[in-house]
């Protein structure tokens, strides 16, 4: 089966020409595929195409999408989690997060995750496989269709480690930027940090995208190596100081600041001495710390840092000259928040 989702306008023009059609037929497919207001769900719906051409595309197994909707969960704050099934009977989750002026799509890059971070539900079932470009992009279509709103922002913070699927990730970003008309500056890629991959991300971004303007978010979650190894098993292979050094180089190469994600775990990493340690670790280059509230999962007994303690931690960082904010949790009552995505209700 050949998926049209992810094809550029030139790709679609070439397909049209290969079937004896004029190039503008490819542009018509492109418009019906990516234009939010005119989007169709199947080849049959593109009634501006000749019937013969539509039949040819269907007979050659051309598709508009890869996924099917299994379940949807609406949180009290309007956050929508979708459980989607792949063609090989795996399951993946994505989340639509609405605010007054925008709709953020939280996308998955893999089915499951190999990193096994102790505070995250996704890694509890391990990695099944990486997602294809069409499967990543199809999540956007489902969110827009279910929420009747165009996606304005993208965060690769769903299931999986994006840098372990870097080729499909960058092709997806290119399509999101060029075909879905979402600026790179409205895209965030979150990674637990893989050895040598931060520099590779910078290098390949310039090769594939021509520029590197999306936000890189490092799931740091600790102020020292000992704590990080205790909650992130893969940290044993990549020392925290080496991560920061690679981030400094990334900023020099791209001109883009790095965001450090810091999940606050009560009694683990939330003391003021940890704030001081963190500020000393990351000071002196263009970065931002995003403090995150812990969202409960069944398998572990971590506790949320009390709000008062979190505010003191934030103030301590700010007083040290660190750019810092506190991310409000969304969708936790339907297990749609950070760290709660998994392969729920998988079809057997």
From Swiss-Prot:
Tell me a GO biological process for this protein: rRNA base methylation
Q: Recite the UniProt keywords alphabetically.
A: 4Fe-4S, Cytoplasm, Disulfide bond, Iron, Iron-sulfur, Metal-binding, Methyltransferase, rRNA processing, S-adenosyl-L-methionine, Transferase, tRNA processing
Q: Where does this protein have coiled-coil stretches?
A: none
A cellular component term (GO) from this record?
cytoplasm
Localization per Swiss-Prot or TrEMBL: Cytoplasm
Q: Which residues bind S-adenosyl-L-methionine?
A: 160-161, 190, 219-221, 295
Radical SAM core domain: residues covered: 99-323
Q: EC no.?
A: 2.1.1.192
Q: What does this protein do?
A: Specifically methylates position 2 of adenine 2503 in 23S rRNA and position 2 of adenine 37 in tRNAs.
What is this protein identified as? Probable dual-specificity RNA methyltransferase RlmN
């Amino acid at each position: 089966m050949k998926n049209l989702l992810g094809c550029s306008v030139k790709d679609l023009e070439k397909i049209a020409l290969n079937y004896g059609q004029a190039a503008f037929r490819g542009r018509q497919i492109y418009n019906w595929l990516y234009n939010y207001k005119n989007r169709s769900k199947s080849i049959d719906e593109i009634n501006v195409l000749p019937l013969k051409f539509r039949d040819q595309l269907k007979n050659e197994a051309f598709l508009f999408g890869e996924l099917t909707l299994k379940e949807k969960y609406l949180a009290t704050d309007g956050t929508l989690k979708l459980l989607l099934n792949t063609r090989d009977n795996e399951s993946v989750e994505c989340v639509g997060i609405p605010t007054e002026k925008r709709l953020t799509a939280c996308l998955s890059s893999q089915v499951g995750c190999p990193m096994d971070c102790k505070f995250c539900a996704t890694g509890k079932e391990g990695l099944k496989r990486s997602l294809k470009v069409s499967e990543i992009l199809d999540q956007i279509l489902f969110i827009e269709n279910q929420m009747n709103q165009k996606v304005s922002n993208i965060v690769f913070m769903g299931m999986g480690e994006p840098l372990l699927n870097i080729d499909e990730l960058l092709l997806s970003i290119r399509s999101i930027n060029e075909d879905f008309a979402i600026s790179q500056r409205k895209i965030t890629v979150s990674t637990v940090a893989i050895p040598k991959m931060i520099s590779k991300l910078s290098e390949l971004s310039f090769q594939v995208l021509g520029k590197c303007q999306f936000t890189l978010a490092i799931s740091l979650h600790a102020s020292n190596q000992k704590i990080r190894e205790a909650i992130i098993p893969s940290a044993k292979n990549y020392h925290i100081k080496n991560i920061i050094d690679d981030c400094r180089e990334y900023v020099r190469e791209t001109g883009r600041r790095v965001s450090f994600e810091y999940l606050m775990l009560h009694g683990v990493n939330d003391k003021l001495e940890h704030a001081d340690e963190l500020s000393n670790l990351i000071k002196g280059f263009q970065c931002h710390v995003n403090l995150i509230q812990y969202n409960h999962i069944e398998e572990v007994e971590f506790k949320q840092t009390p709000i008062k303690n979190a505010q003191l931690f934030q103030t301590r960082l700010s007083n040290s000259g660190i750019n810092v904010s506190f991310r409000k949790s969304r969708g936790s009552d339907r297990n749609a928040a950070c760290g709660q995505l998994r392969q729920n209700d998988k079809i057997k």
